[in-house]
UniProtKB/Swiss-Prot annotation:
This is Methionyl-tRNA formyltransferase. PANTHER family: METHIONYL-TRNA FORMYLTRANSFERASE, METHIONYL-TRNA FORMYLTRANSFERASE, MITOCHONDRIAL. It comes from the Bacteria. The gene is fmt. Its EC number is 2.1.2.9. Attaches a formyl group to the free amino group of methionyl-tRNA(fMet). The formyl group appears to play a dual role in the initiator identity of N-formylmethionyl-tRNA by promoting its recognition by IF2 and preventing the misappropriation of this tRNA by the elongation apparatus. One of its GO terms (molecular function) is methionyl-tRNA formyltransferase activity. It catalyses: L-methionyl-tRNA(fMet) + (6R)-10-formyltetrahydrofolate = N-formyl-L-methionyl-tRNA(fMet) + (6S)-5,6,7,8-tetrahydrofolate + H(+).
């Protein structure tokens, strides 16, 4: 089929690569403009742009999806299907109605659960044991289109958002290829979503990065996993942010002063939560790279009884 592919971050790259390998024709790959990134704020291309150019595909980077010149260019491309994977922009009704076969989207949850911008983060932070990917026919409402296919993926109890992200990106790419095979054969289903079961995954807020030690250890553990690798959960030590990237649950029924360091050992340091304790194994101090907690303790010694956070 003749496609227009819309996507931006790493999550969309396996899907683009899989569709190229499947032999589809690309009228264009549309992605967001280059952005300044890193400490030097160097202007860098989105991962999808780099992948598309390496494959010899034509790339468009509109700054305004409602620009008349862009919309006319899109119309002249005459795509049979628009495929959207983590594009990061809302498509107007005019765009949704443009391709002959419609627009399809790959979403990183088992819809109608976790509609919205941060489905993987939210699933891990909420302690879900299962997630998945969904392909759907796009509708004007947020992630509310009819479902085509779904594939489930377990969330291991120690898994991070980064690990689940990478796995879903690969699983989703395969599901998308299968979805397009069904569409090409005019056999793709349209399964309406049950609105009564819909839940939402809004963008992360800065205050959600703060560890509140008075919460149960399991809740904090899920927060640490859910915010790894980005943006990272943090506590305060001597007024400075200390990001925590790795931890293990210990002493699930232990109680005591929340935020108190109860033990410092070879693997890291143990902190008392509202209920239960956490052995912190990986941290990132200000201006430094992520490091084992044992290495951190060599440069920043810690003693039992120290209080972390704002509790």
């Amino acid at each position: 089929m003749r496609l227009v592919f819309m996507g931006t971050p790493d999550f969309a790259v396996p899907s683009l690569q899989a569709l190229v390998a499947a032999g589809h024709e690309f009228a264009a790959v549309i992605t967001q403009p280059d952005r300044p990134r890193g400490r030097g704020k160097k202007l860098l291309p989105p991962p999808v742009k780099s992948t598309a150019l390496a494959a010899g595909l034509p790339v468009r980077q509109p700054s305004d999806m409602k620009d008349r010149e862009f919309l006319e260019d899109l119309r002249l491309l005459q795509p049979e299907l628009i495929v959207v994977v983590a594009f990061g922009r809302i498509l107007s009704r005019e765009i949704l109605d443009l391709p002959a076969r419609g627009c399809v989207n790959l979403h990183a949850s088992l819809l109608p659960r976790y509609r919205g911008a941060a489905p993987i983060h939210r699933a891990v932070m909420n302690g879900e044991v299962e997630t998945g990917v969904t392909t759907m026919w796009m509708a004007p409402q947020l992630d509310a289109g009819d479902i085509i296919l779904q594939e489930k993926l377990p969330i291991p109890p120690e898994a991070t958002t980064g690990e689940i992200h990478d796995r879903l990106a690969e699983v989703g790419a395969g599901l998308l290829v299968h979805t397009l095979e069904l569409i090409a054969a005019s056999r793709a289903p349209r399964l309406p979503q049950d609105e009564a079961l819909a839940t939402y995954a809004p963008p992360l807020k800065p205050e959600e990065e703060v560890i509140h030690w008075e919460q149960p250890a399991q809740v904090i553990y899920n927060q640490i996993r859910g915010l790894n690798p980005w943006p990272g959960a943090y506590t305060l030590r001597s007024g400075e942010r200390l990001k925590i990237y790795g931890a293990r649950l210990t002493d699930p029924s232990a109680i005591g002063r929340a935020g108190r360091v109860v033990e410092v050992g070879r693997e890291g340091f143990v902190v008392q939560a509202g209920t239960g304790r956490l052995l912190v194994t990986s941290v990132q101090p200000p201006g430094k790279k992520i490091m084992p907690a044992s290495a951190y303790l060599q440069g920043y010694p810690m003693v039992p009884g120290e209080i972390l956070g704002c509790v």
